Design a protein with these regions (language model features):
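Structured C-terminal subdomain patch of bacterial secreted/periplasmic proteins
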Residues: 203-230
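P-loop NTPase catalytic phosphate-binding loop
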Residues: 1-109, 116-178, 195-197, 214, ...
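Glycine-centered helix-coil hinge/cap
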Residues: 142, 188-191
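Short, charged, surface-exposed secondary-structure boundary motifs
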Residues: 182-188
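Conserved C-terminal "switch" segment of AAA+ ATPases
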Residues: 192-208
Length: 241
């Protein structure tokens, strides 16, 4: 298991590193417009967590079937489009099993891409929409002690996406790119600071609802390694079974 914190972002003004662990930051909300670097950072974050938590299991719910995640298509724990509901129910079963057991579990890391699109699609059926929101809310509220962690990426993290105020349970909130005033209020509701203009890969992060910090995503180019690392935690290649 991981013993030291992970350097995940660069604090620009202080010239320091922003470090996290799954204990200190169990859940992550990543937001920003198209082209802001959400997907790139999401891949980077998942890979860094996998490198530090060797026993972790990863689930990817990729509702839009983003080309950046398509290379995971043959892996057991990757779900896209309407199959995301299948994956979420599988995750919920694991989560409920952990709630009634006291053993020391290895981390379960769930990445949900474009949550707003997934909920919008299932809004035609209130029962399905409510089920999604209920599962996510329960994990956000009770997942930490059972080592179940959610990373959510969405362009618009409106409170209506989350049941029972569950959005407040994200301990790591990152807004990439130039957020609208409304977008800032959604993830940094208590801050009235003036935000700097943010180019690709730059934005603001708040840990535990503290004042946002101006940050940059570390530069990296070895995408092959990132994909290889994540694949080791995705439950196996279905084509090899």
């Amino acid at each position: 298991m991981m013993k030291t914190s992970i350097n995940i972002l660069n604090a620009i003004d202080d010239n320091k590193k922003i470090s996290i662990t799954l204990t200190s930051c169990p859940h992550y909300l990543i937001t920003g417009g198209t082209g802001s670097g959400k997907t790139t950072f999401s891949l980077y974050l998942i890979a860094k967590l996998c490198l530090s938590y060797k026993e972790a299991t990863v689930y990817i719910l990729d509702f839009k079937g983003d080309e950046n995640f398509q290379r995971f298509n043959n892996y057991e724990n990757y779900f896209s489009y309407t199959d995301c509901m299948i994956g979420l129910k599988e995750i919920y079963e694991i989560f409920n099993n952990r709630l009634i057991n006291t053993e020391d579990f290895s981390p379960l890391i769930i990445f949900i891409d474009e949550l707003a699109s997934m909920i919008s699609y299932f809004s035609g059926s209130n029962s399905e929409k409510n089920k999604i929101q209920k599962i996510i809310a329960e994990i956000l509220m009770m997942g930490r002690s059972k080592k179940v962690h959610i990373i959510t990426s969405t362009q618009r993290p409106d409170s209506s996406l989350f049941a029972n105020g569950a959005r407040d349970n994200y301990t790591f909130k990152l807004g990439l790119g130039n957020l609208s005033s409304e977008g800032k209020k959604m993830i940094f509701p208590s801050s009235d600071m003036l935000f700097k203009k943010c180019n690709l890969g730059y934005g603001y992060v708040s840990l535990h609802s503290n004042e946002p910090i101006f940050v940059g995503v570390p530069a990296f180019s070895n995408y092959k390694k990132i994909y290889s690392v994540i694949k080791l935690h995705l439950g196996g290649d279905k084509n090899k079974n």
